[in-house]
Amino acid sequence: MKTIIVFLSLLVLATKFGDANEGVNQEQMKEVIQNEFREDFLNEMAAMSLLQQLEAIESTLLEKEADRNSRQKRCNGKNVPCGSNHSPCCSGLSCEETFGYGWLYKSPYCVIPSNG
C-alpha cells in the first residue's frame, strides 16, 4: 500500500511539473528548429561555394583537354616519302633525297638529319 501511495504521489508531481515545463519545451523546440534551418542554410551556402569551385576546376581541365586535342597534324615517320604531295615529316626528321630508295620512287624521304 505504501508503494502505491509513493508511485501515485510521484505521478501527481510529474504531471504537475510536466505541465509547467511544457512552455519551456516548446521554446527549446523552436530554438532547435531555428538552429536546424540555420545549419541547412549554411550547408547550402557551403555546397554552392563547393559547386562553384568544382565548376572552375572542371573548366580548367576542359581547357587543358582541348589543348591536348589540338595536337600536331599527321606527320610521316622515318623512311616514308615526303615532299609537296605528301604530309610533312614528324619532328626530329627532315625531308631529304636519299641514295637508297629515293631514286626508285623519285621522291625525298623522311630521315634523321645528317650532321654533314
Curated annotation (Swiss-Prot):
A Pfam family for this UniProt protein?
A: Toxin_22
| Highest rank taxon of the organism | Eukaryota
Quick one: signal sequence residues? 1-20
How is expression of this protein distributed across tissues? Expressed by the venom gland.
Q: What is any one of the record's Gene Ontology cellular component terms?
A: extracellular region
Where does the record say this protein resides? Secreted
Show the propeptide residue ranges: 21-74
Q: Which GO terms describe its molecular function?
A: sodium channel inhibitor activity; toxin activity
Query: What does the UniProt keyword field contain?
Result: Cleavage on pair of basic residues, Disulfide bond, Ion channel impairing toxin, Knottin, Secreted, Signal, Toxin
InterPro entries linked to this entry? Toxin_22 (IPR012627)
Cysteines paired by S-S bonds:
75-90, 82-95, 89-110
What family name appears in the similarity comment?
Belongs to the neurotoxin 14 (magi-1) family. 06 (ICK-Trit) subfamily.
Question: Domain notes, please?
Answer: The presence of a 'disulfide through disulfide knot' structurally defines this protein as a knottin.
Q: What does this protein do?
A: Ion channel inhibitor.
Protein's UniProt name? U16-barytoxin-Tl1c
Q: Which organism is it from?
A: Trittame loki (Brush-footed trapdoor spider)
